[in-house]
């Protein structure tokens, strides 16, 4: 998985690309550790994630809780269709803040 982080005064944006699974959890954790302490808003862009597993979901929940404990905002941005389906099936779409740049396509 490719991880790109950009920051400004108050916001960290982490763009993920590829598969986010157990094999990538450690590199994700290393890349984002400290962001919730440093920035008031952490955005994780999931628009280019083709696959996500339970270990990756646990990492997102862990980061969300860490941000909440610090009083920071944590947002998942533009989850791809496969990621959105998993978030909805697990109910994490109700527990995590998700924002779309454009309205999500309706599924039939």
Regions flagged by a language model, labelled:
Residues 1-52, 62-108:
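STAS-like cytosolic regulatory interaction modules
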């Amino acid at each position: 998985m490719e991880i790109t982080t950009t920051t400004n005064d108050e916001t960290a944006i982490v763009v993920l690309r590829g598969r986010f699974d157990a094999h990538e959890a450690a590199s994700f954790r290393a890349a984002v550790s400290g962001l919730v302490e440093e920035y008031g808003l952490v955005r994780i862009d999931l628009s280019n994630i083709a696959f996500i597993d339970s270990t990756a979901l646990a990492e997102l929940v862990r980061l969300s809780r860490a941000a909440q404990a610090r009083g920071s905002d944590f947002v998942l941005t533009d989850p791809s269709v496969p990621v959105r389906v998993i978030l909805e099936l697990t109910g994490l779409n109700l527990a995590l803040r998700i924002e779309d740049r454009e309205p999500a396509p309706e599924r039939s």
